[in-house]
Design a protein with these regions (language model features):
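N-terminal TM1-TM2 helical hairpin plus the immediately adjacent luminal interfacial "cap"
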Residues: 16-138, 185-195
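C-terminal transmembrane module of polytopic alpha-helical membrane proteins
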Residues: 1-31, 41, 165, 170-265
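Cytoplasmic-side transmembrane-helix entry/capping segments in multi-pass membrane proteins
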Residues: 112-117, 138-142, 163-171
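Specific transmembrane alpha-helix
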Residues: 121-124, 133-156, 201-213
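Hydrophobic membrane-targeting alpha-helices
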Residues: 45, 101, 124, 128, ...
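Charged, low-complexity, helix/coiled-coil-prone segments
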Residues: 85, 90, 146-150, 254
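Alpha-helical transmembrane bundle and helix-membrane interface signal
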Residues: 104-109, 149-169, 215-226
């Protein structure tokens, strides 16, 4: 197990805040969020201008399909596709506003892992609870980043300036979008397609639990070590359960929230 080194003496609140602010770095640049956003725009342009038919998007080798779960890359690559420009713009806006600050402090590797695991958690969770749907969209990764902000505050609360405002801002964005997703799921459809709130929830759960494990902790205490183990155990148990579930219940098993056609998330 890799141990994270910590300072021998605890920081005072003023020093801790300065220390955390000093962690923001543009060198190396936060390339993961930028590269991911550019890739998503390029994929949207390709499927909009080159192959504009929605049937082509549904037949894309990148989309998550329950009948193609043996093609494991689909659990990740569906996050590069979007059903419309509003869907794309919202996801990119949130992941840039939320992801870049995290990447500047914690580095591209940690944030890249969090984002991709959020995407995977979105499709794995959907495969269990909404087992008969197709998926496009990066909201699993976006919600992993939102929840990672909560993990970041829990880890470094005493070292931050205005941590409560950070939580309020993240909670506002998450609850607003999540409320729309749940409403849309039961009452309407965006772009003629239903929104999968399961992928939002499972992406957020992955971001919170894994974020508490891999994000940098500048204020380590005994209770943080206990929280670290609880988070690691929860994350591992959820991932193992969904993988085993998929192995034991191949398509066309119908999950708790049955649906059809394509969902955006």
């Amino acid at each position: 197990m890799i141990k994270i080194s910590i300072d021998e003496f605890p920081l005072t609140e003023e020093k801790g805040q300065k220390n955390y602010l000093d962690r923001y770095r543009c060198c190396p640049p936060p390339l993961f969020i930028i590269f991911t956003s550019i890739l998503q725009v390029m994929m949207f342009v390709y499927y909009t201008l080159v192959v504009p038919s929605s049937e082509d998007l549904l037949s894309s080798p990148l989309i998550y399909r329950p009948d193609k779960r043996s093609e494991l890359w689909r659990f990740v690559t569906y996050g590069t596709l979007h059903a419309g420009w509003i869907h794309l713009a919202f996801n990119i806006l949130v992941q840039v506003l939320v992801g870049l600050p995290l990447e500047m402090v914690h580095g591209s590797l940690r944030i890249g892992i969090l984002y991709l695991v959020g995407i995977i958690a979105g499709s794995l969770g959907t495969s269990v609870f909404d087992a008969d749907v197709y998926l496009v969209g990066a909201s699993g990764g976006v919600y992993a980043l939102l929840a990672a902000h909560l993990a970041n505050v829990l880890n470094n609360y005493s070292n931050m300036q205005f941590p409560s405002l950070r939580l309020l801002a993240v909670a506002f964005v998450a609850t607003t979008d999540m409320g729309f997703a749940v409403y849309d799921y039961f009452n309407g459809m965006m772009f003629g397609l239903p929104v999968s709130y399961i992928a939002h929830l499972t992406g957020a759960l992955a971001g919170l639990t894994l974020g508490l494990v891999i994000l940098k902790n500048f204020n380590q205490k005994i209770q943080h070590h206990l929280l670290w183990w609880i988070s690691l155990g929860t994350f591992t148990a959820c991932i193992v359960f969904t993988i085993i579930f998929n192995i034991l219940h191949p398509f066309p098993y119908l999950g708790i929230g049955q649906a059809s056609n394509m969902f955006v998330q």
